[in-house]
């Protein structure tokens, strides 16, 4: 595709108009949000709010703050009795999806902070998690 476009300014095969339109819209949305820096700041805020609220209900972030990426956050299981499968189902039934941990030395789960996710979404998720944790006790 690139060579064809570079050579004569045309698509090599049928133009992928839906892909180009989607990419154009994504660039418009990125610009509206303040560019890469604005998007990064939203992700970073999502991460800060998520870690703060979960810590308040007894779920600790696995990675220390200075090494934490704003993209996905890993949390340690709050207790030995914690069941990820039950937790996952509880959250999914309420419209959110999380991920199992990928570590071998400690039980963890992960929550993505990026995409079309805003602080109000993080707050709602944290309310659901708090409801689950209170029901465990």
Please report, for each region that a protein language model flagged, where it lies by residue.
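Short amphipathic alpha-helical segments
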Residues: 7, 69-73, 107-110
């Amino acid at each position: 595709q690139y060579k064809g476009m570079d050579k004569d300014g045309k698509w090599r095969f049928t133009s992928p108009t839906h892909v180009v339109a989607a990419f154009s819209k994504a660039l418009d949305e990125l610009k509206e949000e303040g560019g890469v820096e604005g998007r990064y700041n939203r992700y970073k805020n999502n991460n800060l709010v998520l870690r703060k609220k979960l810590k308040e209900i007894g779920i600790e972030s696995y990675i220390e703050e200075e090494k934490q990426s704003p993209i996905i956050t890993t949390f340690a299981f709050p207790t030995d009795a914690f069941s990820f499968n039950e937790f996952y189902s509880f959250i999914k039934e309420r419209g959110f999806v999380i991920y199992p941990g990928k570590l071998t030395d400690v039980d963890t789960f992960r929550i993505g902070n990026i995409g079309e996710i805003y602080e109000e979404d993080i707050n709602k998720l944290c309310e659901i998690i708090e409801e689950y944790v209170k029901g465990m006790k």
